[in-house]
Amino acid sequence: MPLIEQMWRISAVSISTRYVLIASMDVTPEAESLFNEVYDTEHVPNLLQVPGVHSVTRMKGEPARFAIAGAVRELPAPSPIYTAIYEIDHPQVLESPEWAEAVERGRWPSEVRPHTSNRQHLLFKVR
């Protein structure tokens, strides 16, 4: 099987929705532990209850070395450093009353959000 076909099969199986929201941000070092605790135990579970949200995958960037164009190059850690990928049915999920309520629930808005910066939100349609 050609590599491109293999990649398509992996992609088609890995993402189960037609849209993904990518939310990225930095967090102050003193709030990083609280950020991770609240994101994992409150924020993600709250958003997974929103109709049209199917999964959330969290990640933290790291520096790396990689070979390209005949040389090994340094890849710095990304900025922002934290990213979450939300698989959603359609863009209207993001403006629904359920989404609006979920993002303001728990400790996230009052105890965590003030410690975040460099926030980026990107919406992609899966092809």
Cite the ranges covered by each PLM segment.
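Macromolecular interaction modules
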Residues: P2-R127
